[in-house]
Structure formats: C-alpha cells, structure tokens
C-alpha cells in the first residue's frame, strides 16, 4: 500500500518519464513521448541491457504500446523494438483505493509468450526482486512529486 491517492500514482506510471524514474532494473535510461491517455498510445524508452549482464545488446529503443487503460485504476503495456516484435508479454499496474492510500499491484505476465521466443532467453527477464523494488521506488517518487 502506498500512502497516496490513485491519481498521483497513476500520473507516474502512465508517464514515460515515470517509467524511467521508478525502474529498478537499471535498463531504462530515458524516454521520448507524452503520458499515456488511452489504449494504443505509444512512447519510446531508451534502454541499455548491459545493467542485467545477461546479453551484450548495448543501447537500444523500445516502443511501449498501451494495451489496457482505465484512468487512475489500471494500465498495461507491451514493448517492441526495431529488431524484435512484441513477443506476447505485458507489464502494468492495478491501483485500488484503500483506507490510507492505494494498493498497487504490479502486473508482469509472461504466460502468453510465443513458443518461438522461449528458447531465445530466460523468462521472465526482470526478477521478482526488481519488481518489488520498483514498487518501493514508486512510493518514493510519488512522495517526492509536488
């Protein structure tokens, strides 16, 4: 539970700059684009895979496409890039107002990854500990936002 209202949290998780600010993996470097406002909105995240130490991919860009959107309640997205299509996984957040703040659930679903991609990597790429850390960073970021 984050002691803030859902609108303040949603403002961070729907904004490309917010994605970079709360990333615990170290891969997200910067962003280009406007905050999401609807399904099919897109923005670009400039990445560096070297922080994971698993593949020598260097710097690259991904396009984030919003796949689910309910203002101040729910957002999901998939990623694709110049050298790779969306592979069937998605990320997101579910926000539920509760006494004293908002219950935030991180969504990270790899269950529909296309079989042809499974041999190409270790799934999921982002560890559970990094996802949990992102929630802590999200709380700190929301508290620091005026």
What residue spans do the PLM features occupy?
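A conserved amphipathic terminal alpha-helix motif
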Residues: 103, 107-146
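Hydrophobic pocket/interface hotspot
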Residues: 8-13, 19, 43, 66, ...
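Short, solvent-exposed aromatic-acidic interface loops
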Residues: 78-87, 107-114
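A short, polar/proline- and glycine-enriched secondary-structure boundary/capping micro-motif
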Residues: 55-57, 86-90, 114-121
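Generic structural detector for well-ordered beta-strands
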Residues: 1-3, 65, 78, 94
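Hydrophobic ligand-binding cavity/cleft-lining segments
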Residues: 1-39
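Glycine-rich portal/gate segments that line the openings of hydrophobic small-molecule binding cavities
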Residues: 31-83, 136-146
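Short, low-complexity Ser/Thr-rich regulatory SLiMs
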Residues: 68, 93-99
């Amino acid at each position: 539970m984050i002691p803030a209202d859902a609108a303040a949290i949603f403002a961070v998780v729907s904004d490309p700059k917010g994605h970079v600010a709360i990333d615990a993996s170290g891969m997200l470097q910067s962003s280009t684009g406007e905050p999401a406002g609807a399904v099919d909105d897109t923005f670009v995240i400039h990445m560096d895979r070297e922080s994971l130490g698993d593949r020598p991919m260097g710097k690259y860009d991904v396009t984030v496409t919003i796949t689910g959107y309910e203002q101040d309640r729910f957002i999901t997205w998939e990623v694709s890039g110049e050298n790779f299509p969306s592979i069937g996984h998605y990320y997101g957040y579910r926000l539920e107002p509760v006494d004293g703040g908002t219950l935030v659930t991180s969504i990270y679903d790899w269950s529909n990854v296309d079989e042809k991609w499974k041999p190409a990597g270790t799934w999921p790429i982002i560890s559970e500990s990094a996802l949990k850390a992102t929630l802590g960073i999200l709380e700190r970021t929301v508290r620091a936002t005026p």
